[in-house]
Amino acid sequence: MDVGELLSYQPNRGTKRPRDDEEEEQKMRRKQTGTRERGRYREEEMTVVEEADDDKKRLLQIIDRDGEEEEEEEEPLDESSVKKMILTFEKRSYKNQELRIKFPDNPEKFMESELDLNDIIQEMHVVATMPDLYHLLVELNAVQSLLGLLGHDNTDVSIAVVDLLQELTDIDTLHESEEGAEVLIDALVDGQVVALLVQNLERLDESVKEEADGVHNTLAIVENMAEFRPEMCTEGAQQGLLQWLLKRLKAKMPFDANKLYCSEVLAILLQDNDENRELLGELDGIDVLLQQLSVFKRHNPSTAEEQEMMENLFDSLCSCLMLSSNRERFLKGEGLQLMNLMLREKKISRSSALKVLDHAMIGPEGTDNCHKFVDILGLRTIFPLFMKSPRKIKKVGTTEKEHEEHVCSILASLLRNLRGQQRTRLLNKFTENDSEKVDRLMELHFKYLGAMQVADKKIEGEKHDMVRRGEIIDNDTEEEFYLRRLDAGLFVLQHICYIMAEICNANVPQIRQRVHQILNMRGSSIKIVRHIIKEYAENIGDGRSPEFRENEQKRILGLLENF
């Protein structure tokens, strides 16, 4: 209730039900006194309301006056007050350290100084509202002192420091003053903040709420710093953070917010970072990720938060598979078998497992995984997904386009990498049941060709408008248009056309005839397919070397000669 509600509140006292023999008498009395009573009641009511209004005004005046006094008492935060605060902090920190050394076995002697130290650390939170003054924390060595306290014998003090650092590094605050933020982050990195934070993490007991909060705030510091300065991720991972995250993920503890946060930070550390991906592989991290994900092969996550953690772990695994050495570890760790099982079980994890398989098989580095996938009867799993996109796919946030993109990419990788008997087994799938899989391939071809024609028409219109306005269409603009076309469906269409070229070059007349027959029926032509494949070859990346790109382009264009 606000002040007005408090003053106007009247409790419901209820009414007394009259006995039968009193009813008539009361009716007569009411008739006689009704008019007089109503008049008197209105007068009394007005008096009560006026008194209540007066009380309300007086109370509001007192509250306003107290608020003004509090505002007057608050000292404005400026350079001088921050310096004074830092000096007090340094004095209390030194005093506590001195008393702990002097009376190591007598906590009563240093306990008061510890409380004083904790109080000043709490007061320093106000500095987080003024990032322009962060330079004072560095110039007066407060940052170094705070980092030193991360190893304090009393974890309450180290947790208080973590809480303060988390607020100082809040990403919104850092962006308020780039200069102040740079100075602070430089000092933290120079002081090896991540190594000190990890040492503190090692001794925290998450069964104690305050210490569990300390773990959460520590992870927040890492996330804030990684977002502001992504290059510190490599150094941070090497200072023990990556190892601690893996240990925390595999710890036999119930799922909680900290485990979710660990999965988020892990995904951040691995993003576009080959050094961290290699380090994770060396720390047996691929096995840890597979073990954690194996829980979801037959069971769906029980909460939205647990599903988010699962997706973070899948993202981390996909990121690691960008590195060829990790694909070997994935193969040895029976990752293919786990993903194949997830595809068969039809749980929420299925769409993410499909994405992992795509990453594991792509390019020449995926050759061993492609052969193993056929050996474990993976073709029986992947082709039903090719023939029909799952109905309930929207519930897990994966679009039909994404599903078809991954399936077509996997088939393209299999056709590229398989040799001998396994390749024959794959090609035979396209002749089964009156070439139904060729029919499905052509159905997808026309679906995405139509989407591309719509996108191309829109882009051509935009180009025409730019020329009319006298704007130059440079390489950057062309690249932007190309990326838009890929997103609109060109990426899937390129894989579909590549699959068509591969299977038509396989010396299986039945397949080639069916492809040409359907193209003619739909009024399309080989020229369109050739053009799409040529564009695909021209835009292949360097991969590991320019030589790889050149050889791959020759191989793909060679498929067109017999198409």
Swiss-Prot record:
Q: Where is this region: Disordered?
A: 1-49
HEAT repeat extents: 79-129, 134-176
Q: Which SMART domains match?
A: DUF1716
Where is the short sequence motif Nuclear export signal (NES) located?
130-140
What's in the keyword line of the UniProt record? Answer: Acetylation, Adaptive immunity, Coiled coil, Cytoplasm, Disease variant, Immunity, mRNA processing, mRNA splicing, Nucleus, Phosphoprotein, Repeat, Spliceosome
Locate the coiled-coil region(s) and give their ranges. 476-540
Disease / disorder: Immunodeficiency 99 with hypogammaglobulinemia and autoimmune cytopenias: An autosomal recessive immunologic disorder characterized by recurrent sinopulmonary infections appearing in early childhood, B- and T-cell lymphopenia, and progressive severe hypogammaglobulinemia with decreased memory B cells. Patients may develop autoimmune cytopenias, such as thrombocytopenia, or autoimmune features, such as vitiligo.
Quote the protein name from its UniProt record.
Answer: Beta-catenin-like protein 1
Organism listed in the record: Homo sapiens (Human)
